[in-house]
């Protein structure tokens, strides 16, 4: 696994995690 794919996958994980936190925050969870 090269550095580019590793950085891209970690970026997508952080993006999806922050998006989930925003959705949960709006729902009052």
UniProtKB/Swiss-Prot annotation:
Pfam families: PetN. Keywords: Chloroplast, Electron transport, Membrane, Photosynthesis, Plastid, Thylakoid, Transmembrane, Transmembrane helix, Transport. The keyword Hydrolase does not apply. It is a single-pass membrane protein. Component of the cytochrome b6-f complex, which mediates electron transfer between photosystem II (PSII) and photosystem I (PSI), cyclic electron flow around PSI, and state transitions. The 4 large subunits of the cytochrome b6-f complex are cytochrome b6, subunit IV (17 kDa polypeptide, PetD), cytochrome f and the Rieske protein, while the 4 small subunits are PetG, PetL, PetM and PetN. The complex functions as a dimer. This is Cytochrome b6-f complex subunit 8. It comes from Emiliania huxleyi. The gene is petN.
């Amino acid at each position: 696994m090269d550095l580019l794919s590793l950085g891209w996958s970690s970026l997508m994980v952080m993006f999806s995690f922050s998006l989930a936190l925003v959705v949960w925050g709006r729902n009052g969870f």
